[in-house]
UniProtKB/Swiss-Prot annotation:
GO cellular component: cytoplasm
Organism listed in the record: Nitratidesulfovibrio vulgaris (strain DSM 19637 / Miyazaki F)
Subcellular location: Cytoplasm
UniProt record, GO biological process: L-leucine biosynthetic process
Subunit structure: Homodimer.
Gene: leuA
Protein name: 2-isopropylmalate synthase
PANTHER family to which the protein is assigned, alphabetical: 2-ISOPROPYLMALATE SYNTHASE 1, CHLOROPLASTIC-RELATED, HOMOCITRATE SYNTHASE-RELATED
Coiled-coil stretches: none
Amino acid sequence: MTIESGRIRIFDTTLRDGEQSPGATMNLQEKIRLARQLETLGVDIMEAGFPASSQGDFEAVQAIARAVKGVEVAGLCRAMPADIDRAWEAVKVAENPRIHTFLATSPVHMQYKLRKEPDQVVEMAVAAVRHAAKYTSNVEFSAEDASRSNPDFLVRVFEAVINAGATTINVPDTVGYAQPEEFGRLIRYVIENTPNSHKAVFSVHCHNDLGMGVANTLAALKAGARQAEVTISGIGERAGNASLEEIVMALHTRRDFYQLDCGVVTEQLFPTCRLLSMIIGQPIPPNKAIVGANAFAHESGIHQDGMLKNRETYEIMTPESIGKTKTDLVIGKHSGRNAVKNKLDELGYRLEEAQLVTVFEAVKKLADKKKQIYDEDIEALVLEEVYRLPDLYRLVNLSVQCSDTGMPPTAAVVMDVMGEVKRAAGFGVGPIDAVFNVIGEIVGRAPVLERYSVTAITGGTDAQGEVTVRLRQNGSSAVGRGSDPDIILASARAYVNALNRLAKKEEEQEKEGI
């Protein structure tokens, strides 16, 4: 396939591989919101999910395929006719659909997982690609565990699947085993030795088990690969995937070395990472490359002196280049609905009239509690008010009493449980423990609290606190989040949100017969 020799295609798999990261599950509305942000970011392809895995995933992939424009939408599927059919049904509504089928090629996978001989694996791969090519000319084939596969066997498989109709060949480092120099050699070898390699785009998908995901991806691009499969903030299975923002900024900042470019709008990198962080309730680590809070912080006196004289002494890129600008005041107590609507449009939220009214009312309530409302506050409100699941449980009222007299903290809670108002009160070791105990008593659940974290959304003593909790019960886990200037109220909202997600997940599992 002919492409610009220096143009890298960015294939984002946050919605599929990224969502496999523990605690990163998203509901349908959150997936669509993130997909639209990926569209704004300028990725070439987004992998929307694995349609054959569940009815919920099928519906999400189909909804994303309908929602986004100007970007290819891929559905992942095993090298099986039923999987391929299901993937096509989900993505065919997209402007430019792609079927992404995969099959393992390493000796350990062929022997112990597939229980197939190499000749049989070649036949399966060819049959899968031919089946997919009946639907579309945009077919990607991945050789699972390629980095532990025999290079000559990879060449044999790749030649066969290209002849069968594959237009993208993906070489994954599935378990993060490869080293950069070694992986670069492998990519160069398969491109140079596959007779029809000029008819396909070669791609890489690197995991981060040894911390080499980004380094291996860059080595592969230098060696001739022209598609990088990545995720926002590097989230994904186990230790994660190669990070989109790190790959993009490495190419952007060191264009002199790589002589490569991509179509990503770098100014959208930080807003995209921030959005993902808020959706999945996982804060961006302060020392995270490119987008962490410390990425552009300079504490050393020598560094500060150099920065004051010339920013280039210690900055190889600017905060502005990734969209990390000074937080601007956007909404105040007396702001009107148009101001809120304009800010939502600017942030990339396309809301219906009823949703706009809901957010506007929430903004006004928040403005009564804190003096200044920032972009991050607005985004937190949208995620909480618009993109939440339909509530089985809803917090109506909360009252907490604490003292230093030795009396345990008490909580009184009023909740709407499936349309019925219920009240209860109780004690706890601390105020948050008391609140969680009473909520659990009201809804008749006693999940295990696996994680609790709180972060300030913005600065100032009146800042909203964003609380994230992870609950586990009956083998299922769910992450919930809530925000409010009152940390105890934010905690209660997060707990109820997680309970709703847990109930929804159990309902979906019952439908799937799991």
